[in-house]
Amino acid sequence: MSVQQMRVEITKVYKGERWRLKVLRMTDNQVIAVYHRFVKDGLIKNY
């Protein structure tokens, strides 16, 4: 999964516009870390 795909998936976890903008401003490493945390916590289904 690419970082851009991870970014899209973590954007879906919370519906707010502020969250979406925060995700868009995250570095690639932050996106990867948040994605793996959300998978671990069961907020995102790992494909």
At which residue positions do the language-model features occur?
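Basic helix-extension-helix modules of the SAP/HeH family
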Residues: 1-47
